[in-house]
Design a protein with these regions (language model features):
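Envelope-exposed proteins and targeting segments
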Residues: 2-4, 21-23, 45, 69-71, ...
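Short acidic/proline- and small/hydrophobic-mixed sequence motifs that coincide with surface turns
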Residues: 80-85
Length: 148
């Protein structure tokens, strides 16, 4: 067993952050050169670290067409904290699911991501909603999909 601890030289409050700050901590296991027989597995993974108190994301969603005329959902974060997208659906005004997407993305402050909507086409975004189950509560996170 290995325990790894890390921290900051000053408190988060002393950093005077204007928005949430983000780091990616990478862990790479180096295989032992002494073990020459059999198979060895070296782990290599990274973990996002988000630092800041009281900051909130401010999300907007709209559809665009890519160079092959496929529908793409643009998710933009105008807020001061990251937003995590997981499994979500596109629903109409009555709550009917039009498309389910299973993905995992982080959208950092002042950034956007493009999410391909394979097989989904629409001529109007009127009444369409981005609906995602919230990990923090039993309610869903719901956003209107706006015209571009």
């Amino acid at each position: 067993n290995k325990v790894i601890r890390f921290g900051f030289r000053q408190s988060i409050a002393a950093m005077n952050l204007k928005q949430e700050e983000t780091w990616r901590v990478k862990f790479s296991e180096i295989p032992s050169p002494l073990q020459k027989t059999g198979m060895s597995i070296a782990l290599n993974f990274s973990v996002p670290v988000f630092v800041g108190n009281g900051f909130q994301p401010d999300m907007s969603f709209h559809f665009v067409k890519d160079e092959k005329n496929n529908t793409v959902l643009m998710a933009k974060n105008n807020g001061k904290a990251h937003f995590q997208i997981t499994k979500f659906s596109i629903q109409d005004a009555s709550g009917k699911v039009l498309k389910d997407i299973d993905t995992m993305k982080y959208i950092l402050p002042d950034r956007h991501v493009s999410i391909p909507m394979d097989g989904f086409n629409t001529t109007s975004t009127k009444g369409l909603k981005f609906v995602m189950a919230s990990n923090a509560s039993k309610t869903s996170v719901v956003y209107d999909i706006t015209e571009n």
